[in-house]
């Protein structure tokens, strides 16, 4: 535990660019000047401690920001899209949303999910004739090919997606 805390403090000081004020700083400094510091299961070399890598995570679920964003990411999408019209105050939406995200994630990119908050985007809700929430549309090549209103269980959602994917 102490080794983890020591390592965390040292790495934090490297990232922030400030020297650590802790009493462990001299120990960490000496330990990491050696080619390799191995306290049990941890192995840190100075070059590893200073490298920070970032990767872009492609998500299968995204929030719609505005009308042009909807046009670009949903209507013009080559991938089939499930559009979840929801509201923050809607209890059933809070149940359906995570279920739908889980089922969409299982499809491994064959379908993506767009989330539209009807309070923020009433124009889209009116355009797609959303009269109750949650409303879920299945869109392919810019056209609505299927729709349902209300909560569904995971089996029904999987069948809904299989029909969309083809």
From Swiss-Prot:
Subcellular location per the Swiss-Prot or TrEMBL entry: Mitochondrion
Keywords of the record: Acetylation, Disulfide bond, Electron transport, Mitochondrion, Redox-active center, Transit peptide, Transport
Swiss-Prot/TrEMBL site (Contributes to redox potential value) positions: 91-92
Gene Ontology CC: mitochondrion
Modified residues (N6-succinyllysine): 152
InterPro entries recorded: Thioredoxin, Thioredoxin-like_sf, Thioredoxin_CS, Thioredoxin_domain
Entry-annotated residues carrying N6-acetyllysine: 152
Thioredoxin domain: residues covered: 61-166
An individual GO BP term: cell redox homeostasis
GO molecular function: protein-disulfide reductase activity
Intrachain S-S bonds: 90-93
Feature type site, description Deprotonates C-terminal active site Cys: 84
Superkingdom of origin organism: Eukaryota
Region forming the signal peptide: none
Residue interval of the organelle targeting sequence: 1-59
Pfam families membership: Thioredoxin
Catalytic site positions: 90 (nucleophile), 93 (nucleophile)
Biological role stated in the UniProt entry: Important for the control of mitochondrial reactive oxygen species homeostasis, apoptosis regulation and cell viability. Is involved in various redox reactions including the reduction of protein disulfide bonds, through the reversible oxidation of its active center dithiol to a disulfide.
Family membership: Belongs to the thioredoxin family.
Subunit record text: Monomer.
Protein's recorded name: Thioredoxin, mitochondrial
Organism of this sequence: Bos taurus
């Amino acid at each position: 535990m102490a080794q983890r805390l020591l390592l965390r403090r040292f790495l934090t000081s490297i990232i922030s660019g400030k020297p650590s004020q802790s009493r462990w700083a001299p120990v960490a400094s000496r330990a990491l000047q050696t080619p390799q510091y191995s306290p049990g299961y941890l192995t840190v070399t100075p070059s590893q401690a200073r490298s920070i890598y970032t990767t872009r995570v492609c998500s299968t679920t995204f929030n719609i920001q505005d009308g042009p964003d909807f046009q670009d990411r949903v209507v013009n999408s080559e991938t089939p899209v499930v559009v979840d019209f929801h509201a923050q105050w809607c209890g059933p939406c809070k149940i359906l949303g995570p279920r739908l995200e889980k089922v969409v994630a299982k499809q491994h990119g064959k379908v993506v999910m767009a989330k539209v908050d009807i309070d923020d985007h009433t124009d889209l809700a009116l355009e797609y004739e959303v009269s109750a929430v949650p409303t879920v549309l299945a869109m392919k090549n810019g056209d609505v090919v299927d729709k349902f209103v209300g909560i569904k269980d995971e089996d029904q959602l999987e069948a809904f997606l299989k029909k969309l994917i083809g």
